[in-house]
Amino acid sequence: MEARTTDLSDLYPEGEALPMVFKSFGGRARFAGRVRTLRVFEDNALVRKVLEEEGAGQVLFVDGGGSLRTALLGGNLARLAWERGWAGVVVHGAVRDTEELRGVPIGLLALAATPKKSAKEGKGEVDVPLKVLGVEVLPGSFLLADEDGLLLLPEPPSGVRSGG
């Protein structure tokens, strides 16, 4: 990803912006890709199930309700995401294994880290519209992330490709 979210936001005013309240935990601070969505609460079984699919440069956006009590992604799932070709994962919630996450060469954003693991019951919804920080996150939209924030567009901007 070469273009900056600030420049693209100016060029595409129809884009939705999420402020950088997220912390970067992965090996890449800048990444972009088509969005897959997931809504869960303190249960990461569906996170694993989706990340086991071929990522093809997509970004998984996980709405964990902003809960910081349990981690929805750790080192094992981050490595799985990288091995399956995901460009990144955004977690509106917490992660763990932060030292391991830094070594995985994809974008990994979350609100915070916590040592506590999540439930594994498989509760949640896949590929549904999300509302995070007042912004609608739609499956199939295009997400660009860098140090200035996250930008959601209906289609990829000219010259921007998925990946890091």
Curated annotation (Swiss-Prot):
CDD domains registered for this protein in UniProt: RraA_family
GO terms of molecular function: 4-hydroxy-4-methyl-2-oxoglutarate aldolase activity; metal ion binding; oxaloacetate decarboxylase activity; ribonuclease inhibitor activity
Pfam families assigned: RraA-like
Keywords of the record: Lyase, Metal-binding
Cofactor section: a divalent metal cation
Listed SUPFAM superfamilies: RraA-like (SSF89562)
Functional description taken from the UniProt entry: Catalyzes the aldol cleavage of 4-hydroxy-4-methyl-2-oxoglutarate (HMG) into 2 molecules of pyruvate. Also contains a secondary oxaloacetate (OAA) decarboxylase activity due to the common pyruvate enolate transition state formed following C-C bond cleavage in the retro-aldol and decarboxylation reactions.
Matching PANTHER family: 4-HYDROXY-4-METHYL-2-OXOGLUTARATE ALDOLASE 3-RELATED (PTHR33254:SF4)
Subunit structure: Homotrimer.
NCBIfam families: NOT-MenG (TIGR01935), PRK09372.1 (NF006875)
Entry protein name: Putative 4-hydroxy-4-methyl-2-oxoglutarate aldolase
Organism: Thermus thermophilus (strain ATCC BAA-163 / DSM 7039 / HB27)
